[in-house]
A protein has these predicted regions:
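C-terminal end-helix/capping segment
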Residues: 112-128
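Bacterial N-terminal signal peptides that target proteins for export
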Residues: 1-11
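Short S/T/G/P-rich N-terminal loop/turn motif that feeds into the first structured element of a domain
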Residues: 14-100, 123-128
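Basic side chains
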Residues: 4-6, 68, 83, 111, ...
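A short, polar/proline- and glycine-enriched secondary-structure boundary/capping micro-motif
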Residues: 78, 108-109
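Short, exposed beta-strand-loop hairpins at the edges of beta-sheets
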Residues: 96-99, 109-115
């Protein structure tokens, strides 16, 4: 085999493998995000109706919930919230899309009866 051909073939193979590696690293670079919602329960009966609806909507949108309902919270600085909900998302964009979705908006009447949002925000992890 011609040495120039071997070098050219090796360069093409190297470039292809390098491009594949860069693509793989880029795919892994997507950072997870978490929404944190501090709430005050207004009506426990309404909350028992709302909870399965919002959990189904979150799951349908690809979110993963942590069972923090009724768990203890302690404050290291400032006041501890009364109740906190935490949801894991594949990306900050996915979290934002859910909060802006019809599935979330359509539950507002039930949510407003069940609980009051004190604060809701999303945070992106810096590594997976």
């Amino acid at each position: 085999m011609n040495p120039k051909f071997k070098i050219t073939l090796a360069a093409i193979a190297g470039a292809t493998l390098g491009a594949a590696a860069v693509q793989g690293l880029h795919a892994q670079a997507k950072l997870r995000a978490y929404t944190v919602t501090e709430v005050e329960v207004l009506d426990p009966a309404a909350l028992s109706v709302y909870t399965p609806l919002i959990l189904a909507a979150i799951k349908g949108a690809g979110g993963r919930t942590f069972n923090t309902a009724g768990g203890r919270t302690i404050a290291f600085t400032g006041e501890a919230p009364k109740r906190v909900g935490i949801i894991e998302w594949d990306s900050l964009e996915q979290a934002q899309a859910f909060v802006n979705s019809a599935a979330f908006s359509n539950l507002a009447p039930q949510r407003d009866k069940a609980e009051k949002y004190i604060r809701q925000y999303a945070v992106e992890a810096t590594s997976n």
